[in-house]
Amino acid sequence: MKSVRYLIGLFAFIACYYLLPISTRLLWQPDETRYAEISREMLASGDWIVPHLLGLRYFEKPIAGYWINSIGQWLFGANNFGVRAGVIFATLLTAALVTWFTLRLWRDKRLALLATVIYLSLFIVYAIGTYAVLDPFIAFWLVAGMCSFWLAMQAQTWKGKSAGFLLLGITCGMGVMTKGFLALAVPVLSVLPWVATQKRWKDLFIYGWLAVISCVLTVLPWGLTIAQREPDFWHYFFWVEHIQRFALDDAQHRAPFWYYVPVIIAGSLPWLGLLPGALYTGWKNRKHSATVYLLSWTIMPLLFFSVAKGKLPTYILSCFAPLAMLMAHYALLAAKNNPLALRINGWINIAFGVTGIIATFVVSPWGPMNTPVWQTFESYKVFCAWSIFSLWAFFGWYTLTNVEKTWSFAALCPLGLALLVGFSIPDRVMEGKHPQFFVEMTQESLQPSRYILTDSVGVAAGLAWSLQRDDIIMYRQTGELKYGLNYPDAKGRFVSGDEFANWLNQHRQEGIITLVLSVDRDEDINSLAIPPADAIDRQERLVLIQYRPK
């Protein structure tokens, strides 16, 4: 009966965090609008081989993540939940692997359930796992690889070992098809410390080639097909998206070596109090095969991405699955022997909630700031933000009331965040980061436009997805579409600032021409170097400028 209650509680937890509130949040640009539009175009065109954005070739990532996103929109429609359905599914599948692997290692159902809840409630997992990017997919394939390698090495027969390594190769191949060759580097680096300490080189050399073969066979059909259709895909993807992004001096998203330290700290909420103990206990018990394996899958990817020049918080998402398992194991030990870490965790959550309440007041219309984050007419959003942090502090306090029994309620600290964050986003943020908000305000003007031009790829993708059209023209800036715009068949999809006046004269009689520009909050739109317009509609950071036929 207790198991049934636990399962009902888990399903209610998943519904409140990962299902019910998702549609209340508008899509963020540039990431969510980009991936939403790529998948919409895939469904509309029926081309499941070559990814396109705004009708242009888009070679930043391989195809598998777009397949899953497209299936999400196909099943649930072109709406906010449909766009995020794929990443939510991947996150829940990863959580299922956490459950299974924990059960496999320790044969403890309570520990397995706790590891799952910890994983799903970690701030970084929840933030990325409900956000339409490709990282939850690659995290799933990496965690699946972690489980597959363990299965292979624990098998007692050659058939079991062969099956495990073949499965490992498939997960690596799908990882390559999701985000590239990092899906090969991370597993290799993660298993080497364990193989070395356990002296299992023989099995690795005997059966490892099976993983290589199955990986190649997984990638080969699509890899050959896209090479035939787009011969320069693999050159661009390998050189620009791997070497330049991660290793060269001009790498994207450059950050210092210690960049991931605050990411790990913030990402571990509401279980931050368990982090030092989980890592220390894992190191202290490193002679235990399972513990050192999980520790290696936590630390090695973190070190790898710390050394790389380009860094983003999403890159280390896969580290948190083994970390959640270590945290759960340590938490049960602490509850049984010395609950000090659990008390510290409760106080950390109280401090975080109280700090958030104070910070919300400071940036509210009633605070000391001259330019508050929220305006007076947005008072309900301020109260939503207060509720988020109040609930966080409340559950932090509740875990301290009887710490040996109530400490696990820390999983409910982010409940307010899950339910209310979509209602607390300030208008000034929505106007710049949520193109859907802009489209809703300007729908009547945008809909009849013959041509729409914009200077932001993220805004362009948002407009294209909301209006169900892929012919948005880039104005002044090419951004990440630069490569796709270089193709001969992309002629006419970019208009420079100097060319705009002539372009306008040539196309004005064809219908309404709409220009959507991103501007600074205090920028005078009358100073823009554009021809006089027939209509201007400013929505704070985004401006709609229209030219009608004469």
Swiss-Prot record:
It is a multi-pass membrane protein. The keyword Repeat does not apply. GO terms for cellular component: plasma membrane. Its EC number is 2.4.2.43. It is found in: Cell inner membrane. It holds the Pfam family PMT. It catalyses: 4-amino-4-deoxy-alpha-L-arabinopyranosyl di-trans,octa-cis-undecaprenyl phosphate + lipid IVA = lipid IIA + di-trans,octa-cis-undecaprenyl phosphate. PANTHER family: MANNOSYLTRANSFERASE YKCB-RELATED (PTHR33908), UNDECAPRENYL PHOSPHATE-ALPHA-4-AMINO-4-DEOXY-L-ARABINOSE ARABINOSYL TRANSFERASE (PTHR33908:SF3). Belongs to the glycosyltransferase 83 family. This is Undecaprenyl phosphate-alpha-4-amino-4-deoxy-L-arabinose arabinosyl transferase. It comes from Escherichia coli O157:H7 (strain EC4115 / EHEC).
